[in-house]
């Protein structure tokens, strides 16, 4: 029956279309966080990376903090200059066996900003664009990101700030945790006053180390806290380890289960796993019901979940 072929074709198209998943299953308020900016595409924890993250529509920029000799907040994943991604002020390489002697806590920011941490190809991100870039001050970075977002007609960006802290670093690579938390809080307050715009309500502070989180909670109880975990265990196990009730539970994505997400939600926490870079894992996290995710590749997330 040749006359029936067009109807059969149309019926088949409708069936296939009806079986397609929703193109945007994301719940309202889903938080796309650019890990160290957009680390897969631009040098980590640098202004070019932060601007790229804004261009890609992240709702939050995640970055790490170290402290300079004069107690300024410097954006850096390590409290030293890594030999594989940074060059000395004269352009010479940093000896790998001596990299931990290049301590930010023993340098003024005037010295820190002379190091190039963007021109070397990142060993784990071969597609990352290389360009001259420095470790910026937190205050200057937030102000410039806010200005850039405003110029692009983008809603105010959130900031997820990781305090890099370890008992072995206390007093040598970083300040004592209570001092670190106080310095961060004071700088955020001063920055909010200078910008004359709400800032603290866009801040989250996270750490793998419970100590600075406890110190911050004591002096700034309204700032949301995220606990970072990379070990196996239940949500309750991790809460016992940290000894506080955070607003956000942030485990390594490889350890996340639907049951964990459900339990965290029962306890009133949002779940934002790290660092989710493969599309299949992004899809799985969304299916588990997470409230956001941290990724080096916001562009991949956009391809998977197109947004207006």
Which positions does each model-derived feature cover?
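Phosphate-group recognition and catalysis centered on beta-loop-alpha active-site segments
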Residues: 18-308
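Bacterial N-terminal signal peptides
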Residues: 6-15
